[in-house]
């Protein structure tokens, strides 16, 4: 298995990154020292909101982490309602309007309440892979079949 890293995120004077080797790091941006590390297997870009870090593992678990301590606040299995769970992989996610919008390799878009971790909706967008969702001018978009699609 080759190494896959998440995008690097700079926030709160820290650098955050993770990989598919069970390593999620918070690094002090000034000194380069590791503030904390967690065993999370993810190659998706984390999202930081104030002192909370949201990330989704390659196995489909949503993690919420306390930025200052590195302690895991909550873990939610976002694939628990999918029968073909082992074949599905998270593609990317965004946090907007107190919800996590997670795109999956089976063409589904999962909506999760970020406060409770409860899955609110699953929308089948396509029968194949879709991109990570994007927000522009208060509208959500993703790429499917090599075309840009607006999600209502």
Task: List each language-model region with its residue ranges.
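C-terminal hydrophobic structural anchor segments
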Residues: 92-111
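Short loop/turn segments that connect beta-strands within beta-propeller blades
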Residues: 28-31, 66-70, 113-117, 152
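Conserved beta-propeller blade signature
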Residues: 14-17, 53-55, 63, 99-102, ...
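Surface-exposed loop/turn positions within WD40 beta-propeller blades
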Residues: 21, 59, 106, 145-146
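Redox- and metal-dependent alpha/beta enzyme cores, enriched for Fe-S-associated oxidoreductases
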Residues: 42, 58-67
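Short, low-complexity, Pro/Ser/Thr/Gly-rich segments in the mature regions of secreted, periplasmic
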Residues: 142-151
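WD40 beta-propeller blade core
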Residues: 25-26, 63, 110-111, 149-150
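Extracytoplasmic beta-rich repeat domains
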Residues: 1-12, 30-50, 74-95, 120-137
């Amino acid at each position: 298995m080759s190494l896959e890293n998440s995008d690097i995120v700079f926030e709160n004077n820290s650098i955050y990154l993770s990989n598919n080797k069970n390593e999620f790091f918070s690094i002090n941006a000034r000194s380069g020292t590791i503030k904390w590390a967690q065993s999370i297997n993810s190659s998706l870009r984390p999202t930081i909101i104030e002192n909370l870090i949201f990330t989704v593992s390659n196995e489909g678990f949503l993690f919420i982490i306390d930025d200052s301590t590195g302690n895991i606040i909550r873990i939610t299995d976002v694939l628990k309602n999918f029968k073909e769970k082992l074949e599905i992989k998270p593609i990317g996610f965004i946090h907007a309007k107190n919800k996590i919008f997670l795109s999956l390799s089976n063409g589904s878009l999962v909506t999760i309440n970020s406060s409770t971790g409860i899955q609110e909706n699953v929308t089948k967008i396509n029968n194949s892979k879709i991109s990570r969702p994007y927000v522009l001018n208060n509208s959500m978009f993703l790429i499917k079949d090599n075309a840009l699609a607006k999600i209502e």
